[in-house]
C-alpha cells in the first residue's frame, strides 16, 4: 500500500496502520505545535497525563490516516474510513501508546531524512 521506507507500522486493535509523515501531516502538526521542531518539547511539557495521552492519540491518528488518505487517493472506488481519535483511545491501552512513541519517532525520522548521494566524478578529484 505504502512505500515502507517512508512508514513505521503499528497495530491498533486487529488492524495494522502505517504511520507516515506527509506534507499534509506536517502542515497539521505545524498548525498545532508551530512546527516539527516544537513537537517533542510540547509532548514532554504537556501539563498533565491526560493531556499528554490526548496529544499522542492525536498524533497517531494524524500519521496513521496519511496511509489511508494515500490509499483512498489511489482507490477512489473503494475508499477506507479514516481512523478517529476515539477509535485509537478505545482500541489501545497506555502501554500501547508508550510503544507507539518509538513508531512515531521512526515515522518522523523517515519523513524528514535526506538521501545524500555522492557524484561518481567529484569536482574536487585529484588532478594528475
Please state what every model-predicted region is.
Residues 1-11, 31, 37-51, 72-128:
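Charged interaction scaffolds used for protein-protein
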Residues 22:
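Residue-level signal for threonine
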Residues 55-66, 106-109:
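Short, hydrophobic/amphipathic alpha-helical patches that form generic packing surfaces
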